[in-house]
Amino acid sequence: MELTPREKDKLLIFTAALLAERRKARGLKLNYPEAVALISAAVMEGARDGKSVAALMSEGRTVLTRADVMDGIAEMIPDIQVEATFPDGTKLVTVHQPIV
């Protein structure tokens, strides 16, 4: 199976998000890469489902709370930018202050 670099990046994000999801379900607080991966994957899946950029910018802020992440992580992530594939093409989605 041949994958482009972009497809490899998507799979890496998905794998990290899956790990983060499992750790969160076990009650562990997420670290920086886990938090970013989980929010990024949620945005990418929402785009695949056909949601709008505006909806994903808003929904991206509801994926995690400060209680879900280690101390100081929320402050380390002022925004997350995800290049997501929508039914009408690829667009950049920016989630400002993703962890509240």
UniProtKB/Swiss-Prot annotation:
* Cell compartments where the protein resides: Cytoplasm
Q: What is its main location?
A: cytoplasm
- What catalytic activity is recorded? urea + 2 H2O + H(+) = hydrogencarbonate + 2 NH4(+)
For the keyword Plastid, the answer is: no
Give the matching Pfam families.
Urease_gamma
Q: Which NCBIfam families match?
A: PRK13241.1, urease_gam
Binding partners and assembly: Heterotrimer of UreA (gamma), UreB (beta) and UreC (alpha) subunits. Three heterotrimers associate to form the active enzyme.
Name under which the protein is recorded: Urease subunit gamma
Instruction: Tell me the organism.
Output: Variovorax paradoxus (strain S110)
